[in-house]
Amino acid sequence: MLMLTHTYLLQKVLGAADIKNQDLDIYIYNIAPDLLTIHPNINSDKTHNIKRFAEIPVKYPQSVYVMFHLLVDDLAHFGSICLDYQEAFNPESQGFCYIKGKPLIKSILDLHKIIQNEISYNEAAYRSHLIIEMIYDLVILKEINSLKTISLLVEAINFTFKNKLAEFTSTIGWLYDVQESDVQAVMKDACAYLTKERVERIMNIEGRIRLYSDKFGLKSKDNLFYEGIKKLFIQAKNSLELDEKELFLHQAAKTIKDYGWMPPIT
């Protein structure tokens, strides 16, 4: 899932547990597995390929919020919590995003034939799940706006950079074995890149098409190709809206609670 969905779910979980007055840096720990990939030398395999734990490390208690992110992604990608990261790609995964993305696969394959840039079934399956992730926070946008999630996330980034950077870099450095200078660079870039205006600019279908096209280098000027991608996103959005919109989030929160995850008491 994308960073806004992760942030919104954490807001809901903490609200349901009546946990208040937490410092805002917890939301940046929660998006760290995605945020760190801003750095050219850090990829999602590195940020997601760590052993899962529910216990709270005494010296690095905020790392439990990184784990919350990874547990949610496990359920979205694999359909269950994985004690160890699953390196082998499975296009038939029973994770929420892959199940929901499966009806898009054939259309993705056909679209790439239009620009004579054919891709494999496995690659199409991977891209289909990303479309689901990219559209999901648009499906729950009303709920996101009701909790002012965008403003919260932007405020949290700036708060962490100004007030909690040393602690954050130390924790992330321990968890991922990365240079603290790299973490500091990520946070500096995040403050410049993740502004309220920039985030709001991509909170629509067109913004998500740009994200998708940029990620995969799809620069085709073929209008039929563009309309095909747009149709995929609309199809995905309509499919998700047929369900109870937050069902996956409710189920994920319960599964993670049953697993034993809980925020540190401060």
Label each PLM-derived region with a short phrase:
Residues 1-266:
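N-terminal leader/auxiliary helical segments
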